[in-house]
């Protein structure tokens, strides 16, 4: 007896097989694009490598972009969207950079795999490769993919921890994203290649908590060094390395933790990590250990899982990372 299969049943079966073969967007896994865009990671690595050769500071810039995107509304590339009131326009994001590198990667990927790879995954892969390059090739963590791009980007929704917060306040924000205290301490280790502007530390140098004096938790010698770089009367907002070990401030390593342990943290939150009861032992363990890079990689993977869009109706695969698919560019 012949079995009749309806058109709808065939369609459902086809979709099920497609999902089995390629994975379902929103369900992160390693090798998500292994069948429908096999060369994507090589393409990303090539473009990122060229960008790093031109300007190695793209590494900390991309780590920051990744963090700012994931932490506010989840890893959905909403930070990349242009608009008069998009996330880019929020005060903490005005100095974020790296967008052009993402554009270059997306353009190269689209030539090989049209509307397959999300911008959110491109950010995650590019950041991973730049961490590898900044470490001198000493680490390379595997990052699951399968993210969808978000459709909403609003400056009003940006919610990032301030460098002036206490450890407890910062930890609470991480906890809201299901990121642990351990994740927080490790992710702040990205500051080992980071920089900040003088404006963020002027209070620590000249008027800590309205005392008209420097922050007593900062090494006096460092106060002197930074005051010379960030004078009160300056008309420019200078740039300061967050890792004050001059020999390794451009290298992903454990030096940042060693510096904050001897009161040479630049940002308020960085220094507090080393002296707060919640985190001081973690800082000591990392500073004295040899597995920071491995642990940092795992924390970056955990960050990359924050509020990933799991329903296709809520996300999309953009053709341009700067605009949603409501835009003609997506046609």
From Swiss-Prot:
Any one biological process term the GO annotation gives: response to oxidative stress
EC code: 1.11.1.7
UniProt keywords, alphabetically: Calcium, Disulfide bond, Glycoprotein, Heme, Hydrogen peroxide, Iron, Metal-binding, Oxidoreductase, Peroxidase, Secreted, Signal
Cellular component terms (Gene Ontology): extracellular region
Cofactor: heme b; Ca(2+)
Top-rank lineage group of the source organism: Eukaryota
Record-linked PANTHER family: PEROXIDASE, PTHR31517
The keyword Ubl conjugation appears for this protein: no
Residues annotated as the enzyme's active site: 68 (proton acceptor)
Tissue distribution: Expressed in roots, slightly in leaves.
Role of this protein: Removal of H(2)O(2), oxidation of toxic reductants, biosynthesis and degradation of lignin, suberization, auxin catabolism, response to environmental stresses such as wounding, pathogen attack and oxidative stress. These functions might be dependent on each isozyme/isoform in each plant tissue.
GO molecular function terms noted in the UniProt entry: heme binding; lactoperoxidase activity; metal ion binding
Binding site for substrate: 161
Pfam families: peroxidase
Signal peptide: 1-26
Note: There are 73 peroxidase genes in A.thaliana.
Residues that, per the record, bind Ca(2+) 2: 192, 248, 253
Residues marked Transition state stabilizer (site): 64
PROSITE patterns in UniProt: PEROXIDASE_1, PEROXIDASE_2, PEROXIDASE_4
Group of enzyme by EC: oxidoreductase
Family: Belongs to the peroxidase family. Classical plant (class III) peroxidase subfamily.
Positions that bind Ca(2+) 1: 69, 74, 76, 78
Protein's UniProt name: Peroxidase 60
């Amino acid at each position: 007896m012949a079995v009749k299969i309806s058109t709808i049943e065939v369609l459902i079966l086809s979709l099920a097989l497609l999902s089995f073969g390629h994975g379902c967007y929103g369900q992160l896994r390693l090798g998500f694009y292994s069948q429908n865009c096999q060369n994507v990671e090589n393409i990303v690595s090539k473009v990122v490598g060229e960008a790093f050769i031109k300007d190695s500071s793209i590494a900390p810039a991309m780590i920051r972009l990744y963090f700012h995107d994931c932490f506010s509304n989840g890893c959905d590339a909403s930070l990349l969207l242009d608009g008069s009131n998009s996330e880019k326009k929020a005060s903490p994001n005005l100095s974020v950079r790296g967008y052009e590198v993402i554009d270059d990667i997306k353009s190269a990927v689209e030539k090989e795999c049209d509307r397959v790879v999300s911008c959110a995954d491109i950010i995650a892969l590019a950041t991973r490769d730049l961490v590898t390059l900044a470490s001198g090739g000493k680490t390379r963590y595997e990052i699951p993919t399968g993210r969808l791009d978000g459709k909403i980007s609003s400056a009003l929704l940006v919610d990032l921890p301030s460098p002036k917060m206490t450890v407890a306040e910062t930890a609470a924000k991480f906890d809201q994203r299901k990121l642990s205290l351990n994740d927080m301490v490790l992710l702040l280790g990205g500051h080992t290649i980071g920089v900040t502007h003088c404006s963020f530390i002027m209070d620590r140098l000249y008027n800590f908590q309205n005392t008209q004096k420097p922050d007593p938790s900062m090494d006096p010698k460092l106060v002197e060094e930074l005051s010379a770089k960030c004078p009160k009367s300056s008309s420019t907002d200078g740039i300061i390395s967050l890792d004050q070990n001059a020999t390794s401030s451009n290298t992903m390593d454990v030096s940042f933790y060693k510096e904050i342990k001897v009161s040479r943290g630049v940002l308020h939150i960085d220094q507090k990590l080393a002296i707060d009861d919640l985190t001081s032992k973690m800082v000591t363990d990392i500073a004295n250990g040899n597995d920071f890079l491995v642990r940092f990689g795992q924390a970056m993977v955990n960050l990359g899982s924050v509020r990933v869009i799991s329903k296709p109706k809520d996300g999309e695969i953009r053709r341009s990372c700067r605009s949603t698919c409501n835009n003609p560019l997506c046609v």
